[in-house]
């Protein structure tokens, strides 16, 4: 009996795993812990091999403490499906961030922009809500010289 249950779960996971290799376009919202900023962005899942996908994304970090940011990421996910409609994934990739800060000095507003490249590392959890919708939560750490940053985000994607 145990063997039949195991085979059923394995085949359900295999059938659903094919659904993980579809393109997806979505929106996300997140929080950057070190700078206490809220983010919003768009992402795309582009599969290139079984359970592998490239994930480009663009995020805007809203101003907090007179600091805002644009971020472009290129990550790779390896999906590990389980229980039919769920998967976990490690992620790794690159980041480009452009931070802008404003300050007032002698009644003049000064602004400073810093552009940095970095490396992303993290993990995520994804759930297929329906045939065309998925939901994910993801945590990553961005290694950038003098500006390392922890980030958590949630996203909703449309699969096509």
Predicted feature locations:
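Gram-negative (and chloroplast) outer-membrane scaffold detector with strong preference
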Residues: 45-107, 116, 127-133, 157-160
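Residues that define the transmembrane beta-barrel architecture of outer-membrane proteins
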Residues: 21-23, 36-40, 68-72, 86, ...
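Bacterial N-terminal signal peptides
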Residues: 2-10
